[in-house]
Design a protein with these regions (language model features):
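A short, structured loop/turn motif at beta-sheet edges
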Residues: 109-118, 146-152
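Solvent-exposed serine/threonine-rich low-complexity stretches and specific carbohydrate-binding patches
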Residues: 89-96
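Surface-exposed loop/turn elements that mediate protein-protein interactions on large endomembrane-trafficking
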Residues: 78-89, 145-152
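Acidic/hydrophobic-patterned starts of short beta strands in beta-sheet-rich repeat architectures
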Residues: 44-55, 111-124
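Short consensus segments that form the blades of beta-propeller domains
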Residues: 56-71, 96-100, 128-136
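Acidic, small-residue rich beta-repeat scaffolds with periodic aromatic anchors
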Residues: 2-40, 125-197
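N-terminal "first-domain core" detector
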Residues: 12-81
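Repeated scaffold domains used in trafficking and secretory/extracellular systems
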Residues: 102-107
Length: 197
């Protein structure tokens, strides 16, 4: 399983900004950094970790042949510093398009399971305004368990929590308005507390 392989390590140059560092080690040559590169002082016992999200597109394949369509993706990575300015690169997840390219709205930490560690939350949205008669965004939050042994993993473990499904916030083609309950990190954290986490 990929989640149990060792993570790749990369050297961060002296004085190199977090943006230049993650741009230099991007996973796909055509990838662009999406949003802000986050360098977090503390996540449980991990200090100065970096979170980066890369947007890219790939040609679609059907039955082994190109289908003439391009699909967009956003890949998330966690970079954990080790000794001598080296960083372990751990894959978070891929967020595929849902009618549009995923946009990472928020990266946050909250308790989402029964242990004391805070988990990683990633809130994504997808613009739906390109569909005739529809105006708004789809929202989905993803949770990932805190990696207790970072030297033995290459991918974060996702956590499923009931009640945090895809939600539409906007107006559908019948003119009906929907409001997403969980379209901000603050609302998600409040619900996690209500659930007893």
């Amino acid at each position: 399983m990929a989640g149990y392989c060792s993570a790749q390590t990369f050297q961060r140059n002296i004085g190199e900004s977090k943006e230049d560092f993650v741009k230099r080690i991007k996973p796909v040559q055509s990838a662009e950094i999406q949003g802000e590169v986050l360098e977090v002082k503390q996540w449980n016992n991990l200090a100065n970790s970096i979170f980066a999200f890369y947007e890219y597109s790939e040609e679609g394949i059907e039955k082994g042949k190109p289908n003439g369509l391009n699909y967009s993706y956003v890949d998330g990575y966690l970079l954990i510093p080790s000794e001598n300015n080296r960083y372990k690169k751990i894959f978070i997840d891929t967020y595929a398009e849902e009618g549009a390219t995923a946009y990472v709205e928020s990266v946050f930490f909250a308790n989402a399971d029964r242990d004391a560690d805070k988990e990683l939350g990633v809130l994504c949205s997808w613009d739906q305004s390109m569909h005739y008669g529809i105006s708004g965004r789809i929202y989905q939050v993803y949770f990932y368990d805190f990696p207790k042994a970072t030297d033995k993993i290459s991918k974060l473990k996702p956590i499923q929590i009931k009640g945090f499904d895809f939600e539409f916030d906007g107006t559908n083609d019948a003119g009906e308005r929907s409001v997403a309950k969980f379209n901000t990190a603050a609302k998600i954290k409040a619900e996690l507390k209500r659930l007893g986490f």
